[in-house]
């Protein structure tokens, strides 16, 4: 190990940051490193961090549906721009969180912002995280949901023949893996 490795700077004192961001960072940095926590404690840290900030959730309509495809039941949350009609193209959102953390409540604000900014509905896939799911269960659930949306999008008010895949962090990884699988299997 390199003895010259330096400690990361304390960004909580960065004069360029908004005071609310500094306060948020102080709270995050006050706890133990997330990798040292149990999965339950780590999930709670993320949940608490997201719920500690009041956010604008206006401009959207949410609905939930559990679909079954290829023998897998997968819960979906459909997030539409308020006042939208018909079956427009959509984007499928796959959340990050190191395969272990995250869910719709921790990503609700991000999905809302993407829906409002783009004007298109999102379909949030509530895949089973690790360690409850063993590889490749989460990817199988995501691909099953994408196949179902492609075939049945009108049932949830979207055009499943015109969808994009998106995700943050590990969700981006799984979006790419899903696109590659669709190409390999000549699927949606």
Feature annotation, model-predicted:
Residues 1-78:
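A glycine/proline-hinged amphipathic helix-loop "lid/cap" segment
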Residues 87-97:
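Short beta-strand element of the alpha/beta-hydrolase
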Residues 80-83:
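Short, low-complexity Ser/Thr-rich regulatory SLiMs
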Residues 63, 123, 166:
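Conserved Rossmann-like nucleotide-binding pocket used by diverse enzymes
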Residues 95-97, 127, 131, 167, ...:
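Conserved phosphate-binding and hydrolysis motifs of nucleotide-dependent enzymes
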Residues 103-104, 110, 118, 123-162:
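Catalytic nucleophile-loop/oxyanion-hole region of alpha/beta-hydrolase
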Residues 144-188:
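Primarily recognizes the serine-hydrolase "nucleophile elbow" in alpha/beta-hydrolase
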């Amino acid at each position: 190990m390199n003895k010259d490795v330096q400690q990361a700077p304390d960004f909580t004192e960065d004069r360029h940051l908004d005071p609310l961001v500094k306060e948020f960072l102080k709270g995050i940095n006050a706890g133990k490193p997330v990798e040292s926590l149990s999965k339950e404690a780590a999930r709670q840290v993320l949940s608490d961090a997201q719920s500690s900030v009041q956010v604008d959730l206006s401009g959207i309509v949410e609905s939930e549906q559990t679909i079954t495809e290829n023998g897998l039941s997968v819960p979906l949350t459909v997030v539409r721009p308020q006042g939208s009609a018909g079956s427009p193209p959509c984007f499928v959102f796959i959340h990050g969180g190191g395969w272990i953390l995250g869910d719709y409540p921790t990503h609700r604000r991000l999905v809302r912002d993407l829906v409002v900014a783009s004007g298109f509905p999102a379909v949030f896939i509530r895949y089973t995280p690790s360690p409850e799911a063993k590889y490749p269960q989460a990817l199988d659930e995501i691909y099953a949901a994408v196949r179902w949306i492609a075939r049945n999008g009108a049932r949830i008010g979207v055009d499943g023949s015109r969808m994009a895949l998106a995700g943050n962090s590990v969700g981006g990884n799984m979006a790419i893996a899903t696109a590659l699988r669709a190409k390999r299997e000549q699927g949606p």
